[in-house]
Regions:
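Transmembrane helix boundary and interhelical loop/hinge segments in multi-pass membrane proteins
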Residues: 87-107, 121
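Terminal transmembrane helical anchor/hairpin motif
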Residues: 29-67, 189-255, 259-263
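Long, hydrophobic alpha-helical segments
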Residues: 69-93
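Aromatic- and glycine-rich beta-strand/loop motifs that create alpha-glucan
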Residues: 1-24
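Hydrophobic/aromatic residues in alpha-helical transmembrane segments
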Residues: 83-90, 138, 171-172, 218, ...
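A structural motif at transmembrane helix-loop-helix junctions in multipass membrane proteins
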Residues: 160-199, 203
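Secretory targeting signals
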Residues: 118, 122-170, 174
């Protein structure tokens, strides 16, 4: 059981470790610069930015370590870049195997197409979980190293609640992967989809009468700034993201089961 999931997870292990180290080091670099901003009027600088930009990246209380981490690490690197990455990786999974004719070999075994999709998704969950286990340790250690303090509970929650968000981005990529047979096209479409959804939420969030449009975006349900700065945990948003993930994975299974591979 779960042979496909184990194989795919092991194949991504080295890349996951490299990504975790890279994000951890980048976070430490950002933190190393924070003390030098002590005398700067960061709040005044932020007020000079357009409201849409402030809304897009959740800029709030940037003069505090919580606000600084929220904007520099979690709003940009974690929410946007990592969301794009997991969607990209998922989109190239099944489409890549189909393009390289590896999927024909997999399906020659006693395994259903639905199981292939589910186990592929399970393997894609491993990097998400690993990153959320490794990176917060580096961030917390970095905060202490520069003489600052941060709520360990809030830091843990910003990572815990990012899991449903990242899984939703993964599911978007997976759904695209079963529709297209060229990995490069699927990956680019997944990146474009997640980025456009990010822009939709960013633009409509501060627009009277149009806020509801942003509810189609995964970023609508995960706000690192609210967690780190205000200690507000959006459990409802996490449930919505998990439900959306389940629907997308189910849809991907159905589409892949009914599709004609290689067409």
């Amino acid at each position: 059981m779960l042979e496909i999931a184990r194989y795919e997870a092991e194949r991504r292990l080295r890349g996951t470790v490299a990504l975790a180290v890279g994000i951890g080091v980048l976070s430490l670099v950002f933190l190393a610069f924070f003390p030098s901003f002590g005398d700067a009027d960061l709040e005044g600088l932020v007020e000079a930015y357009p409201p849409a930009f402030q809304e897009a990246f959740g800029i709030q209380a940037i003069g505090t370590i919580e606000g600084f981490l929220a904007i520099e690490v979690y709003q940009f690197v974690w929410l946007l870049l990592l969301g794009l990455y997991v969607a990209y990786a998922a989109a190239s999974s099944i489409a890549g195997d189909v393009e390289r004719d590896r999927m024909d070999l997999v399906l020659s075994l006693p395994v259903s197409r639905g199981r292939v999709v589910l186990e592929t998704f399970a393997a894609l969950c491993v990097p998400v979980l690993a990153l959320n286990a490794i990176v917060p340790v580096a961030v917390y250690g970095g905060v202490l190293a520069i003489g600052e303090s941060i709520s360990a509970a809030d830091l843990a929650m910003v990572h815990l609640l990012s899991i449903p968000y990242l899984l939703a981005c993964t599911a978007i990529g997976l759904a695209i992967s079963v529709v297209l047979t060229r990995a490069s096209v699927a990956s680019r479409l997944a990146i474009a989809t997640v980025f456009v959804l990010f822009l939709i939420e960013s633009i409509t969030a501060g627009t009277d009468g149009y806020e509801w449009i942003g509810s189609i975006s995964p970023t609508h349900y995960y706000d690192p700034t609210a967690i780190l700065v205000d200690g507000a945990y959006d459990w409802h948003g996490a449930v919505v993201l998990l439900a959306a993930t389940a629907v997308l994975v189910f849809l991907a299974s159905v589409l892949f089961a009914r599709g004609d591979i290689g067409s």
